[in-house]
């Protein structure tokens, strides 16, 4: 009774300080008090659940008010787990929250004794560090802020995706967009990164008063309106695109796939609207120059497999190995977690200067000029071997699209029959059986 009465007095004290102007300075003190309560009470105590609710209530206030970290979902999942260690992965923009998240997980769980955060930068959901976690003895990985690109069934440890949602204000968008899109019958697409996608349906209904034709595109298996730096959608008969997010990396994938489209970016953090531009002709001319240089090295090449999480696709590796054998191209295979000039120079030696990288397709598009060697993507390797055609009108961004071609992670046997016909080299029964052993 003595502990409970002191708890009630302190609870009233917290209520009395809520309306104070400087009440924010009391939050760490309240959490320190509740930390002592957690240590003094047993997990089976009746008051534990009450203090836990109060702890969560005041812990939420230490986070930004517009961030949703799915703490209740985390709590439910932790109640079903029996491991005493957790491995966390957070994007670079959310790394400042990792201490708070580790503390709250240790408080709400009955078994967790240690929580470790990966020091490697998590660029996307393709960087799932399940192998690294297993090597250090962790059986559970909490991955924050990305969509489910890598199936949890393919991971060697239990991976739990935590979808971090960011709420934002879009009340002034109709009046601002009315100046940019003058006609009511303009066809407009709305897209965003996964953190902001939860508000897309509300934005669509909100903008329906100003525009008649609004669409939220979807590239399966991604969520409606979701955009990746390596996966976007083909746009036809549209007046423009509204992209919600910060930075240019993700939205540039739309420019690669649709060079002539009008794109307006709304940054929720700065609340600014920007009309974006992109020099697509320069990117195409660079690609053509690299492919022309690579024609001198078609007798041999090197495949470099991205080992940063799950970036590299073993299916794509098997397909380009088959294509190399079919075209009588000698190859060597290497793996690396980081692709840079130093690693390529060390690996090169007397080898060919042509490298086909199987990590992120944007490396060959954005940073090809920074490499001393020729670094091509599987799509560009297909152009080099005449397995696909490139007309210069667009660069496909469909790496995680289910309807993608042989250079994508969902490629199938049907894609191989299509690509080999382009070079008047139809697969025979012998080659078909040979390829089935690869795939």
What are these language model-derived features?
Residues 134-146, 184, 189-190, 234-244, ...:
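A polyampholytic, Gly/Pro-enriched intrinsically disordered region
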Residues 3, 58, 65, 76-77, ...:
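Phospho-regulatory, Ser/Thr- and acidic-rich intrinsically disordered linkers and terminal tails
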Residues 283-286, 290-292, 315-376, 381, ...:
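A C-terminal functional module that forms or caps the active site or interfaces directly
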Residues 2-33, 40, 44-47, 51, ...:
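Peripheral docking tails and interdomain loops at the edges
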Residues 57-72, 78-258, 263-270:
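The feature marks the mature, well-folded catalytic cores of soluble enzymes
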Residues 203, 250-331, 338-346:
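Redox- and metal-dependent alpha/beta enzyme cores, enriched for Fe-S-associated oxidoreductases
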Residues 146-148, 246-248, 308-309, 360-363, ...:
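Short glycine-rich anion-binding loops that position phosphate/pyrophosphate groups of nucleotides
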Residues 126-128, 170-175, 225-228, 273-280, ...:
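Short, charged, surface-exposed secondary-structure boundary motifs
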